[in-house]
Amino acid sequence: MVVRDYNTELTYIERISTNSFRIKKGFQPNMNVEGIFYANSRLEKLMFDELRNSCRPGMTGGFLPGVKQIANVAALPGIVGRSVGLPDIHSGYGFAIGNMAAFDMSDPTSIVSPGGVGFDINCGVRLLRTNLFEKDVKPVQEQLAQSLFDHIPVGVGSKGIIPMNAHDLEEALEMGMDWSLREGYVWAEDKEHCEEYGRMLTADPSKVSMRAKKRGLPQLGTLGAGNHYAEIQVVEEIYDKYAASKMGIEELGQICVMIHSGSRGFGHQVATDALVEMEKAMKRDKIETNDRQLACARINSVEGQNYLKAMSAAANFAWVNRSSMTFLTRQAFAKQFNTTPDDLDMHVIYDVSHNVAKIEEHIVDGRPKQLLVHRKGSTRAFPPHHPLIPVDYQLTGQPVLVGGSMGTCSFVLTGTEKGMAETFGSTCHGAGRSLSRAKSRRNLDYRTSCGIWRRREFPSGWRRRSWSRRKHPIRTRTCVMWCRPVTTWASVPSASSCGRLR
């Protein structure tokens, strides 16, 4: 592959509005469609600095710059529209995190790629509301935080307290939240306020390896590590009172709980197993990609179908996992306030996935088409009146949950028609990353990090050594950096703003 200098690379990238950029064909070999990415001035600098650094002599290894990853996805067989980079985009395995792409189901060459879903399949966010207010929680903040720690297992290697045997796991993988409902871990209405109603019907546990099942069995109902969290949040600002009221968010100071987790080691193993099989399928079917991390298979091949069935099972695992933690969160609150979750009005506002591939109908060149939409670090954002969103949100659009980094605000958005047309009903998912985990461990001081969290009045139990550095403000971006481009700039129309939580 020819290595170009930075100025030559820039000739393939065109600013098309204040906050959006087109990546022209030719930027990377064999591009079938153009790429596009959205960024404000600060994110723009991060993206182009990353590209500039990659052009320096001797800069090899690690992930490619996000801009090049968007372009490499644009070269995959069967892609339609554009390869889209959303405002929290940063480099990842294969696809950049914050990259979405759609593939034509009627095209026999179209592919599915585990790198377009990620290793933490159906990593997602769930938001619960309560009838509590900041004044109720502030005096017992430390005790409530400890109660959550006591109820929800956290960290690498954590084991769940939800009783489950191998037979239960098989049923949970197939049934998703229907299993949780049957076992009494969720309320019936929880399922209605969940993407796909908490169950991928295409799941087939027989396509999942025993190793994946062995890894997943003890982890149900656990938060995990990394950027996962169960966070008590306060409604700080309401932008759209009608949309907020439909979600049960009525007043400033109201307490909500956001749970961010996924399929844990189970999903990671499903992805790992699939990559091995897909490399074989690529050789057999003579599929070539610009990056070996984009290992893939034809959608309708045995390998492609097996992956989609196993991925769906992992997605169901993740919904059961978040449902189990919802149960445990309700128990923690009930214990602290000596009442019931029902009396605390602890209803699920919505649950969204941001690492998944799903078959959806979209308009392409004026005609409806069945597409396999890959969203990696990307949240579904369907508009008002869409048949796949709950009755409660038909007039507002789907709630879109965008979690902030530790110590910064999160946002609740709603999907729009314009976003449906321009980004296949997708938007950003989180704060994004400025430093890798390895760099944060090397460069960020634990005592300094703890000082920041202490000044922000974080409960002492939350100031753990690894978390303090992972969530350091220098390492992670803030939601305001990209929720403003998503919600208010005409060039990034994928969602409209409803409210802000801190």
UniProtKB/Swiss-Prot annotation:
E.C. designation(s): 6.5.1.8
Pfam hit, one: RtcB
Protein name stated in the entry: RNA-splicing ligase RtcB homolog 2
UniProt GO BP: tRNA splicing, via endonucleolytic cleavage and ligation
Cofactor: Mn(2+)
Gene Ontology terms, MF aspect: GTP binding; metal ion binding; RNA ligase (ATP) activity; RNA ligase (GTP) activity
Organism expressing this protein natively: Culex quinquefasciatus
Residues at the active site: 429
Family as reported in the entry's similarity comment: Belongs to the RtcB family.
ATP-binding is among the record's keywords: no
Function: Catalytic subunit of the tRNA-splicing ligase complex that acts by directly joining spliced tRNA halves to mature-sized tRNAs by incorporating the precursor-derived splice junction phosphate into the mature tRNA as a canonical 3',5'-phosphodiester. May act as an RNA ligase with broad substrate specificity, and may function toward other RNAs.
UniProt binding sites for Mn(2+) 1: 120, 123, 228
Subunit annotation: Catalytic component of the tRNA-splicing ligase complex.
